[in-house]
Amino acid sequence: MERRFFESQKGDRAAKTGYFGASRRPRALRFGLPEVLANHMGSPTMYTAHTVQQRGLTLELDDPPSPCDIAPEDHSKDGTGIGQVWQAATDLLCDWLESHAQWVKEQGRSLELGAGVGVPGMLVAKMGAEVTITDYHPRVVSRLRANVALNGLDPLASVALLDWGEPTSDFQRYRLVFGADLAFAQRCAAQCAARVRELCDGIFLYAHQERHAIFMGPDGQVQREATDSGLDSLLEAASPLECRQLCERDLPEGERVVLLALGAPAALAALPSTSTA
């Protein structure tokens, strides 16, 4: 399946900015990293919409489901990554969800964590399944509601504010919880896992682009973390849930993105068969 992002606003001027691309060195230097450290960063890890002149993006998928329209927002001066698309992991998650649409619908209303623009959650709704799409940032939640309305997905898709550091008493338990690239730091990974244990009554489907932190050692030499500490923290905090890798996809420069399923042994055993992507 081919998935392409393109600018839906007509006109050459808009089309020039309506693409998804990677910004590696410029973004690194914008965070104030020394140039020697920026030069050692791996392949692009975050794909962001160039939104200075953006008027709307359409996510083109196989039919069904039909395309998803993304409401515009200007992140050009925002270096936080909040509400942006982490494309490699999102692609893998969407591919699996679409390939197992019947199983997804059988799980009842599902829950997306850390949704950003909400592409996987809207895909689930366009497949005819109920889903609650969540994020912790009010601005992102507002944009999610706009995206759901833009695509006419109410009432299949609902949007809610969910802060992983706060109680979740307003939420039910879900047989399917999913998300992409949520374990980008140890603290948030542990908080995410705690919410998964509270809210998941079946399978947590998690797509993750493996990352190894680059840092400056005491001797001034650039060093690379031996393990993916964010993912390690999530898996440790999710215990006693067991983990099974469903598929993986190679990325440039030796990196990869993996799709993991976390759950009790019985829930993992009931998953549909899958193969390496």
Specify the residue positions occupied by each region the protein language model found.
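S-adenosylmethionine-dependent methyltransferases
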Residues: 1-277
